[in-house]
Amino acid sequence: GFKVERWRAYDETGMVFGYPSEVEVDVTVSDGKLILIEVSSHVRASDVLQFRRKAELYEKMTGRKPDRLIIVTPYIDEKALEAARQLGVEAYTKV
């Protein structure tokens, strides 16, 4: 089995958005693998980069490196798909 929980933290240095702000991401552990998940109605390349930065912040603050980064969306731009490939983010569009 697995459990999904929302992780929230305050990004004091502005690592994710470029200014200090609240950051949240969905986290699940399945078969001992740590997975970060972002669900969005429409994903652009900038969203993929932002999600990658959330993962880096998560690792920095918790000391736990995610095994997988997953974006789930009904619509993703072509440039976002390319960004996901280059940044090691899995994109699921037909779930």
Predicted regions and their residues:
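Active-site metal-binding core of divalent-cation-utilizing nuclease and nuclease-like domains
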Residues: F2-D31
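Structural signal for conserved beta-strand scaffold positions within catalytic alpha/beta enzyme cores
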Residues: R6-A9, E38, I71, T93
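Residue-level signal for beta-strand positions within conserved beta-sheet cores that form or flank
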Residues: V23, K65, L87
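Conserved catalytic cores of phosphodiester-cleaving nucleases, focusing on short active-site segments
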Residues: V25-D47, F51-E56
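Arginine/glycine-rich "motif VI" loop of SF2 helicases in the C-terminal RecA-like domain
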Residues: L57-K65
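Short active-site oxyanion
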Residues: P66-I70
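Domain-level recognition of nuclease-like catalytic cores that cleave nucleotide substrates
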Residues: I71-V95
